[in-house]
């Protein structure tokens, strides 16, 4: 009987470790997101943006891993929300604000105080959006009504963070092709952009979710799809920032199109 007990205890330990994997991914993503602030303090804007992108990747992976391993838990859901608040609510705010200060070389504390207000608004909207997401998820789990199509209500926080950092991404692309950005980027317009992204996050506009993308591929099209994926990967590797800008543009265009699609099928 004793060997069986030992075997059972080992199995339980292994099971507990497996259940911790999604939470480990969440914590690592948060740490990487916070590292973006460090790079911003060093004026390394590319690395700062990359940290937010990696944090968004880990945010996607931890959810998928939790569902695959059947390791979803209440503490995991709360940890995920707190991590998102840090990685996508605080980090991009600090990065973009420090970037504005650097490009304007503004030392007027009065104007800098005004510039800071939209960023506070963004962080607040991000937290409110996460709170609403948690609440609606709990309510949806109690109901068995099937959805016609899966979607997010408002722009999700990872997408909102990437949208927020679009001015930096555009500057990187302009410098990549030898264009000067001196005097082109005005803090006022950046602040308007921050406000627009903030409103989109807390809006009731349905936005596209990966779960809503369901496309059956026939056997004949497999080769074509694989070739397309390989070519796309090659382009992304060659022009990462240009590809990122294109992806952001496509996502922005998809917002009104997908909203009209959801309205039509309801």
Ranges and model annotations:
Residues 1-13, 142-144, 148-266:
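C-terminal membrane-associated helical module and adjoining short loops/tails
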Residues 1-60, 244-247, 251, 258:
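Topogenic membrane-insertion module of multi-pass membrane proteins
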Residues 14-25, 32-37, 41-46, 50, ...:
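"…together with the soluble PPM/PP2C metallo-phosphatase catalytic core" -> "…together
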Residues 21-35, 87-94, 158-159, 163:
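The first (N-terminal) embedded transmembrane alpha-helix
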Residues 25, 48-55, 118-121, 125, ...:
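Hydrophobic alpha-helical transmembrane segments of polytopic
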Residues 35-50, 93-119, 167-189, 237-241:
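Helix-coil boundary and interhelical linker segments in multi-pass alpha-helical membrane proteins
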Residues 50-96, 131-138:
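Acidic (Asp/Glu-rich) catalytic motifs at the cytosolic membrane interface
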Residues 61-68, 128, 256-266:
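Juxtamembrane membrane-interface segments at transmembrane alpha-helix termini
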């Amino acid at each position: 009987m004793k060997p069986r007990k030992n075997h059972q205890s080992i199995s339980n330990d292994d099971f507990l470790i497996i259940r911790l994997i999604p939470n480990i991914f969440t914590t690592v993503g948060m740490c990487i997101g916070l590292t973006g602030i460090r790079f911003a303090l060093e004026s390394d804007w590319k690395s700062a943006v990359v940290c937010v992108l990696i944090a968004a990747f880990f945010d996607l992976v931890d959810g998928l891993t939790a569902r695959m391993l059947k390791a979803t838990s209440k503490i995991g859901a709360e940890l995920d929300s707190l991590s998102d608040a840090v990685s996508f609510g605080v980090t991009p705010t600090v990065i973009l604000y420090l970037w504005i200060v650097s490009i304007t070389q503004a030392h007027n504390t009065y104007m800098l105080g005004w510039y800071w207000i939209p960023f506070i608004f963004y962080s607040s909207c991000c937290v409110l959006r996460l709170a609403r997401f948690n609440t609606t998820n709990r309510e949806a789990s109690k109901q068995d009504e099937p959805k016609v199509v899966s979607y997010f209500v408002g722009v999700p926080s990872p997408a909102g963070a990437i949208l927020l950092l679009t001015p930096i991404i555009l500057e990187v692309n302009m410098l990549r092709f030898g264009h000067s950005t001196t005097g082109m980027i005005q803090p006022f317009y950046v602040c308007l952009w921050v406000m627009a992204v903030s409103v989109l996050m807390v809006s009731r506009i349905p936005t596209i979710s990966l779960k809503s993308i369901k496309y059956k591929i026939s056997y004949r099209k497999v080769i074509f799809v694989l070739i397309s994926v390989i070519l796309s990967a090659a382009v992304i590797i060659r022009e990462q920032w240009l590809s990122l800008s294109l992806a952001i543009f496509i996502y922005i265009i998809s917002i009104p199109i997908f909203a009209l699609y959801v309205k039509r099928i309801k």
